[in-house]
A protein has these predicted regions:
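Short hydrophobic/aromatic-rich motifs at helix boundaries and adjacent loops
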Residues: 1-5, 33-36
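N-terminal acidic leader/helix
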Residues: 2-26
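Short amphipathic alpha-helical segments, especially helix-boundary/capping motifs
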Residues: 6-10, 37-42, 66
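Amphipathic, hydrophobic secondary-structure cores in small proteins
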Residues: 22-24, 28-55
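Long, compositionally biased
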Residues: 50-75
Length: 75
């Protein structure tokens, strides 16, 4: 049961953070999804979601942006 809860929490966080990222960086959700996939942001979210979801959303968004920027993203 704990694994199901953790998976549910992870899905909820990812579903929340991608539109927040889109709003913060003036993209629509689809553009944000492709941007995050292309520049490593989604892999970062997927791997570190547990830490990101406990952080202030502005810091989490900045961390995700920094990962993308280091991988060639220029938004």
């Amino acid at each position: 049961m704990a694994m199901e809860k953790q998976l549910s929490d992870k899905i909820a966080f990812i579903s929340y953070i991608i539109p927040m990222f889109a709003d913060a960086y003036k993209m629509n959700t689809q553009e944000a999804w492709f941007y995050l996939k292309q520049y490593g942001g989604f892999d970062f979210i997927n791997k570190h979601w547990w830490a990101l979801h406990t952080d202030n959303v502005l810091y989490a968004l900045n961390d995700i942006y920094e990962v993308c920027h280091k991988n060639g993203g220029r938004r």
